A protein has these predicted regions:
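Phosphate-binding loop/pocket of nucleotide- and phosphate-handling active sites
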Residues: 161-216
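Glycine-rich phosphate-binding loop and adjoining beta1-alpha1-beta2 segment
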Residues: 1-20
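Short acidic active-site motifs
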Residues: 35-37
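Oxidoreductase and adenylate-handling cofactor-binding alpha/beta cores
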Residues: 90-92, 152-166
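A conserved mid-domain beta-alpha-beta active-site/ligand-binding segment of alpha/beta enzyme cores
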Residues: 95-149
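Conserved acidic residues
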Residues: 29-31
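ADP-ribose/adenylate-binding Rossmann-like module
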Residues: 46-89
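A short, aliphatic-rich alpha-helical micro-motif
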Residues: 40-42
Length: 216
């Protein structure tokens, strides 16, 4: 409860300094925008995606800039009680080529982002409070178990990249681990969301995203 009501940025900065008091942090309280994205990525070796799910325009901008600068970009999404992981190599498939959200309205972009994040959808059958998720109101709470799994998978992947210790499969390869079902699934979606399997998945996802708040 010590951090209740405080900004996420200030809270995470304090946590990082508690772990390493000598850490050098550059904070961007105004957010990442076209005007400061180059400064944001200055001297970056690996980009770890920590943007909110609904910040898709900013995410697309940062991933595009990472590719332009030759920076590896990784994302790990907390889904249900698991994590879905993707790695975008500067020499491999791009974020845009994989997710293919250009030219679509907002809800369809969200649908395509979800489908691309987790082609396996291992978490689809155990959500007990579906009303907690509302894409119209931009609500999608995460469990702490999923967030901790994201941190573990991401930390290990960054270590492998920075130290050159073993290979890391890049998009269109993906990985989803679900602790609830105790399942690990590797996915391969050539052509990204243009893959026929993704078309079928999108047919399942679109109606879910159209749900509004429950009627009294």
């Amino acid at each position: 409860m010590a951090f209740m009501g405080q900004s996420k940025m200030d809270t995470l900065a304090r946590m990082a300094k508690d772990i390493n008091p000598e850490i050098n942090l550059r904070l961007f309280p105004q957010g990442v925008m076209p005007e400061n994205v180059d400064e944001f990525l200055n001297d970056v070796d690996v980009y770890v995606d920590g943007l909110d799910f609904f910040a898709l325009p900013a995410r697309r901008m940062v991933f595009a800039k990472c590719r332009e600068k030759g920076i590896p970009a990784l994302t790990a999404a907390p889904l249900g009680m698991g994590t879905a992981f993707l790695y975008f190599s500067p020499a491999g498939m791009s974020f845009e080529d994989y997710f293919k959200v250009e030219g679509y309205e907002q809800q369809e972009q969200y649908a395509r982002f979800i489908a691309g994040l987790s082609p396996a959808m291992l978490n689809r059958d155990y959500l007990v409070a579906p009303e907690a998720v509302n894409f119209i109101e931009k609500r999608g709470p995460s469990t702490i178990m999923a967030c901790d799994l994201c941190a573990g998978v991401m930390g290990t992947s960054v270590l492998k990249l920075l130290l050159g210790r073993g290979s890391l499969k890049a998009a269109p390869w993906g990985m989803h681990f679900d602790a609830y079902h105790q399942k690990l699934k590797s996915t391969w979606r050539p052509f990204g969301n243009s893959n026929p399997l993704q078309w079928l998945l999108l047919k399942f996802i679109r109606p879910v995203l159209q749900r509004g708040p429950p009627r009294g």
